[in-house]
């Protein structure tokens, strides 16, 4: 009896293979398709409207530079005035601005571009590499390969001329870019054959090394190799052959940068580098001596070769004197000179003997030599001063006033005159008290009455208080 057939396989659940049978335990408001959901008709998944609808991302890009067809032969109305294309205006034209556009010349009319409707998603709009064609980088690779071929040809040519093979050197020597402009302290931060200081003494029982923090306590010991290395840390050697070593290293780097020659490596081939440096120095000295000899033959100067004492004293010489400068660049404790103004001083114009602003009067600046208020005027000297004083006296009326000394003399004379007049008046008054018989019998005459009226003081007269005074009212 044959075995029974296997049970049928249950269909896969999901968006593609969903169950055709409805689940009675799913509520109606979930399983019912809303009115706005699109019904494809053939879909058997009654819960499709509840599943995540994954759509393919549109990452398309327009074809840059694609045209609709061949270019027109003459200018068309409404086209770009610069290039003649119908798909854009002159303000949106990306072609080179012409002195005379295609509208006026009718030449070199560009074809119409294909305007594509590119609708991208959120990620596609923000993709910096969207639309990039990797084939564009092929031009960079080709340029690099051409330069590499030229470099190899030059090396082969140089090897044929010199008669020795040029080694390529290790990868580090070719790819490292140690510029001569880079500080020496940066290039020599760490040597590859250097040993870390915490590896010099790994004795766990020693008080010098702390295994927990992996540090050496108190900078190591005092009389061993570790202490010597710590003493040299951060110290730039300037004695012995340090300067010569720096020159040799710099020469090797410059030779590699200029010609790509790695045979003058300082550590790999120090003898060749030293020989080439010595040879180059001898050639430079020979050229300099030859140049000096030619100049002496042409212009002479054997007798003036020795520098004069004045020039020799002006030369900068080394000194051990310690000099300290302040924040503005002056020597501390040095003599303080008079600060010079940035403006020109003691420069007199137009025959003046003083500068403008050396005299002040009536809220005005002027020249003290001639009392002139006009800037850049011609100096008149003492005559100008006298003219100015006369003008001031005429303007203020000070010339009508008496000098102080004359006023004192006149005051004394006036007092004497008043005293004499007072005595005369007193004597006349005493005499006037004695009336004659005629005066006692007779009446007042017309002349006496008129004199009385003339001499009578009117109290209402505003000038009455000034009577008897000889002072000038100003």
Swiss-Prot record:
Main location (coarse class): nucleus
A GO term for molecular function: zinc ion binding
InterPro entries: Slu7_dom, Splicing_factor_SLU7
Claim: Iron-sulfur is one of the keywords in the record: no
Extent of Basic and acidic residues compositional bias: 280-296, 410-421
UniProt zinc finger (CCHC-type) residues: 78-95
Location relative to the cell: Nucleus
GO biological process per UniProt: mRNA splicing, via spliceosome
Job description of the protein: Involved in pre-mRNA splicing.
Family: Belongs to the SLU7 family.
Quaternary context: Associated with the spliceosome.
UniProt protein name: Pre-mRNA-splicing factor SLU7
The species this protein was found in: Pyricularia oryzae (strain 70-15 / ATCC MYA-4617 / FGSC 8958)
């Amino acid at each position: 009896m044959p075995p029974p057939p296997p049970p049928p396989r249950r269909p896969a659940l999901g968006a593609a293979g969903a169950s055709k049978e409805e689940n009675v335990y799913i509520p109606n408001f979930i399983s019912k398709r809303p009115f706005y959901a699109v019904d494809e008709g053939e879909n058997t998944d009654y819960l499709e409207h509840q599943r995540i609808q994954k759509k393919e991302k549109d990452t398309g890009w327009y074809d840059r530079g694609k045209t609709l067809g061949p270019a027109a032969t003459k200018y068309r109305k409404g086209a770009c005035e610069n290039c003649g294309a119908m798909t854009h205006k002159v303000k949106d034209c990306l072609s080179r601005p012409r002195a005379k556009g295609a509208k006026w010349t009718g030449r070199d009319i560009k074809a119409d571009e294909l305007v594509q409707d590119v609708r991208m998603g959120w990620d596609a709009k923000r993709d910096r590499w969207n639309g990039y064609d990797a084939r564009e980088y092929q031009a960079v690779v080709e340029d690099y390969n051409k330069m590499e071929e030229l470099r190899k040809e030059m090396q082969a040519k140089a090897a044929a001329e010199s008669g020795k093979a040029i080694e390529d050197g290790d990868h580090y020597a070719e790819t490292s870019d140690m510029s001569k402009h880079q500080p020496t302290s940066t290039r020599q931060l760490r040597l590859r054959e250097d040993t870390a200081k915490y590896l010099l003494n790994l004795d766990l029982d020693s008080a010098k090394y702390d295994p927990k923090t992996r540090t050496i306590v108190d900078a190591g010991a005092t009389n061993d190799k570790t202490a010597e290395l710590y003493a040299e840390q951060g110290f730039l050697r300037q004695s012995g052959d340090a300067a010569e070593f720096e020159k040799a290293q710099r020469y090797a780097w410059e030779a590699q940068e200029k010609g790509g020659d790695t045979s003058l490596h300082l550590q790999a081939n120090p003898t060749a580098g030293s020989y080439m440096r010595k040879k180059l120095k001898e050639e430079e000295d020979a050229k300099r001596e030859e140049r000096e000899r030619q100049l002496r033959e042409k212009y002479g100067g054997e007798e003036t070769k020795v520098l004069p004492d004045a020039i020799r004293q002006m030369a900068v010489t080394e000194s051990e004197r310690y000099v300290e400068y302040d924040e503005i660049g002056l020597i501390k404790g040095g003599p303080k000179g008079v600060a010079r103004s940035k403006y020109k001083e003691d420069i007199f114009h137009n025959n003046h003997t003083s500068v403008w602003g050396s005299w002040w009067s009536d809220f005005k600046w002027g020249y003290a030599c001639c009392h002139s208020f006009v800037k850049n005027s011609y100096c008149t000297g003492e005559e100008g001063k006298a003219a100015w004083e006369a003008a001031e006296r005429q303007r203020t009326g000070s010339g009508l006033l008496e000098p102080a000394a004359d006023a004192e003399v006149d005051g004394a004379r006036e007092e004497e005159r008043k005293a004499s007049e007072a005595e005369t008046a007193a004597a006349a008054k005493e005499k006037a008290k004695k009336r004659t018989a005629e005066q006692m019998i007779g009446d007042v005459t017309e002349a006496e009455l008129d004199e009385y009226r003339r001499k009578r003081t009117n109290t209402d007269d505003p000038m009455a208080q000034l009577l008897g005074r000889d002072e000038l009212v100003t």
